[in-house]
């Protein structure tokens, strides 16, 4: 029996990860809030069907970069983005890009659960309705059920779909928001600290869900939890003072990072 050494297994996994195509490519991305520069020439590529974690101390630019990926920064007055970001081969900052369509392709789950003040059913069906993804009530019903199943919530709410989404627990509300995001069949899902307001049990459910969603979606997650980044991601990018310090396979980042700043942050020497 040919038993591969641990080093050989690690090398094989690295080679396999390196063959995964890029879904989004960021070239020399800088962000300005008025005269203040928040990101400095970031070059970061996001691999398809992979969970990429963005880590770093508060104010380092990780959430700012995340918001550039679906142009959420457009909603901030005096915010300016330079450089280039492509989704497949589409330049998402090209003037011809429909931003509403872009945000259907690149969905977002925020730090605090933010269900609409509508029923559970309407929370999930809203996106497919406005984007014309369901032509009949039967098709809409199917999208709602499938999305809630993907979010691991269907069995908990299937008998109360007309109750308000705001009546769910915090963890359930966050999974409802994930169901709402996947209902429009995005290609990428962005998550900005999706578990920071949740208890450990709800966090575990969301993390399990992230593992399952990776089969069908590309996921980028901002997290302050090193343990969470290590558990859920395959790639990790470290930000500091608006700069991308390094990006690599998660296992390598947490065991043998290339930059001392990454080592210091992971070890809790600053944060």
Curated annotation (Swiss-Prot):
Sites binding ATP sit at 56-63
Among the GO molecular function terms of this UniProt record, one is:
ATPase-coupled phosphate ion transmembrane transporter activity
Q: Which GO terms describe its biological process?
A: phosphate ion transmembrane transport
State the annotated membrane topology for this chain. Peripheral membrane protein
Main location (coarse class): membrane
> Looking at the keywords, is Repeat present?
no
Q: Which UniProt keywords apply?
A: ATP-binding, Cell inner membrane, Cell membrane, Membrane, Nucleotide-binding, Phosphate transport, Translocase, Transport
Name the SMART domains on file.
AAA
| Major enzyme class | translocase
Subcellular location per UniProt equals:
Cell inner membrane
Supply the InterPro entries for this chain.
AAA+_ATPase, ABC_transporter-like_ATP-bd, ABC_transporter-like_CS, P-loop_NTPase, PstB-like
Where does it sit, as one GO cellular component term? plasma membrane
Q: Looking at the keywords, is Cell inner membrane present?
A: yes
Q: Which domain of life is it from?
A: Bacteria
Gene3D superfamilies (UniProt xref): P-loop containing nucleotide triphosphate hydrolases (3.40.50.300)
EC annotation? 7.3.2.1
**Its catalytic activity?**
phosphate(out) + ATP + H2O = ADP + 2 phosphate(in) + H(+)
Domain ABC transporter: where? 24-266
Q: Which family does it belong to?
A: Belongs to the ABC transporter superfamily. Phosphate importer (TC 3.A.1.7) family.
Q: How does it assemble?
A: The complex is composed of two ATP-binding proteins (PstB), two transmembrane proteins (PstC and PstA) and a solute-binding protein (PstS).
Q: What does this protein do?
A: Part of the ABC transporter complex PstSACB involved in phosphate import. Responsible for energy coupling to the transport system.
Full protein name: Phosphate import ATP-binding protein PstB
Which lineage?
Bacteria, Pseudomonadati, Pseudomonadota, Alphaproteobacteria, Hyphomicrobiales
């Amino acid at each position: 029996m040919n038993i591969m050494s641990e080093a050989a297994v690690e090398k094989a996994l690295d080679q396999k990860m390196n063959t995964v195509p890029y879904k989004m490519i960021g070239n020399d991305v800088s962000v300005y809030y008025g005269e203040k520069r928040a990101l400095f020439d970031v070059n970061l590529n996001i691999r398809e069907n992979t969970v990429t974690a963005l880590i770093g101390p508060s104010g380092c630019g990780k959430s700012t970069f995340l918001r550039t990926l679906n142009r959420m920064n457009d909603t901030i007055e005096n915010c300016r983005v330079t450089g280039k970001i492509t989704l497949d081969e589409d330049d998402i900052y090209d003037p011809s890009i429909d931003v509403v369509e872009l945000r259907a392709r690149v969905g977002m789950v925020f730090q605090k659960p933010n269900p609409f003040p509508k029923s559970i059913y309407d929370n999930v069906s809203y996106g497919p309705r406005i984007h014309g993804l369901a032509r009949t009530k039967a098709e809409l019903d199917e999208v709602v059920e499938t999305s809630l199943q993907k979010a691991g919530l269907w069995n908990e709410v299937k008998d109360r779909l007309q109750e308000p989404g705001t009546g769910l627990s915090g963890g359930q509300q966050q999974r409802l928001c994930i169901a709402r995001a996947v209902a429009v069949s995005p290609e990428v899902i962005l998550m900005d600290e999706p578990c920071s307001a949740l208890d450990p049990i709800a966090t575990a459910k969301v993390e399990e869900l992230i593992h399952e969603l990776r089969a069908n979606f590309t996921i980028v997650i901002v997290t302050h939890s090193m343990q969470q980044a290590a558990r859920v991601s395959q790639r990790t990018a470290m930000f500091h003072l608006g700069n991308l310090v390094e990006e690599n396979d998660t296992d390598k980042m947490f065991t043998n990072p290339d930059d001392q700043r990454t080592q210091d942050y992971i070890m809790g020497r600053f944060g």
